[in-house]
Amino acid sequence: MTNIRKTHPLLKIVNHSLIDLPAPSNISAWWNFGSLLGLCLMIQILTGLFLAMHYTSDTATAFSSVTHICRDVNYGWLIRYLHANGASMFFICLYMHVGRGIYYGSYTYLETWNIGIILLFAVMATAFMGYVLPWGQMSFWGATVITNLLSAIPYIGTTLVEWIWGGFSVDKATLTRFFAFHFILPFIIAALVMIHLLFLHETGSNNPSGIPSDSDKIPFHPYYTIKDVLGFLMLILLLMLLVLFSPDLLGDPDNYTPANPLNTPPHIKPEWYFLFAYAILRSIPNKLGGVLALVMSILILAIIPFLHMSKQRSMMFRPISQVLFWILVADLLTLTWIGGQPVEHPFITIGQVASILYFSIILILMPLASLIENKILKW
């Protein structure tokens, strides 16, 4: 008799995705981040669901409802901080996952890559709207500043901003709709993840060498299931260290002050995972130019596959590209630091240099390095 997992219509899908899936024998720990992102999404949906049971999306009660969750709900503080720091873990895994894709040339799977970019935008939108919900000072002013960027769009800008706000400023209507979108988006993300995996399983996984591995496959279970579980344990350990020892390490103290439209905080800044993009936005003196640079800082990922000039897929055997890649990583860390600094000398100049370097590496230097490496191969 054939095993039920191979015949049952539903179990068959699970079997082909998680059990009998042929996987390359040499994929490293950098391939763990996909499953870690799945774990993060599940943690966020579960903790978010329990938070939504106690949260009220009204300007008069939003802040106090979050306080109530932390003080009066059984383990409410734990759920709240798991959700807040879970978002940070989510973005750490996201950036590692994207970095892995760039380093090992995984972007040549165009459909998977493009769905991934849409996923990145969706997660960023969800995180932004979630940050507004506690209705602290940084929530309110962050929402005001970021939504206001849309007013830079010619002709329809102002109308568009007021349409999103549901009024003439960030108020009740804005908070209610942000809560609605923040609730629905993770489920849309989960659906997109399924499409992401569908396209991935059309081609199979890439591997560190970038060379087709059809001749050397191993079953996903038990080899990579056990490897993923190790990753899960490490992620949960790191998350628990954050939540139980310093839950506010990555947050902003200003958000413990209730939102006040009459009092602007001295430094308005987003959560740490948006700081690199915020630094790029601020480094351009023109409003529309800044907004375009902000969008392009993420959308540039869609151009990367078309700038792939190398005869090799992976960077494993491409030393010049490797150096450029790690300079890019250092540059992103620099931008993250600058995004959190006040707008004054020397931070303005450092931010502008780092922004130019970011676009130069991706658009000019990496393709050039690939062409040089192709030449070296011929010698």
Curated annotation (Swiss-Prot):
Task: Give all cystine bridges in this chain.
Answer: none
Predominant location of this chain?
Answer: mitochondrion
Cofactor annotation:
heme b
Q: Output the superkingdom of the source species.
A: Eukaryota
An example of a GO molecular function for this protein is: metal ion binding
Q: Name one GO biological process term.
A: mitochondrial electron transport, ubiquinol to cytochrome c
Stretches that traverse the bilayer:
33-53, 77-98, 113-133, 178-198, 226-246, 288-308, 320-340, 347-367
- Cofactor binding remark: Binds 2 heme b groups non-covalently.
Q: Binding of a ubiquinone: at which residues?
A: 201
* The keyword Ribonucleoprotein is annotated on this UniProt entry: no
Alphabetical list of PROSITE patterns matching this protein: CYTB_CTER, CYTB_NTER
| Gene Ontology cellular-component annotations | mitochondrial inner membrane; respiratory chain complex III
| Additional detail | Heme 1 (or BL or b562) is low-potential and absorbs at about 562 nm, and heme 2 (or BH or b566) is high-potential and absorbs at about 566 nm.
Q: How does it assemble?
A: The cytochrome bc1 complex contains 11 subunits: 3 respiratory subunits (MT-CYB, CYC1 and UQCRFS1), 2 core proteins (UQCRC1 and UQCRC2) and 6 low-molecular weight proteins (UQCRH/QCR6, UQCRB/QCR7, UQCRQ/QCR8, UQCR10/QCR9, UQCR11/QCR10 and a cleavage product of UQCRFS1). This cytochrome bc1 complex then forms a dimer.
Q: Which family does it belong to?
A: Belongs to the cytochrome b family.
Task: Say what the protein does.
Answer: Component of the ubiquinol-cytochrome c reductase complex (complex III or cytochrome b-c1 complex) that is part of the mitochondrial respiratory chain. The b-c1 complex mediates electron transfer from ubiquinol to cytochrome c. Contributes to the generation of a proton gradient across the mitochondrial membrane that is then used for ATP synthesis.
User: Mind telling me what this protein is named?
Assistant: Cytochrome b
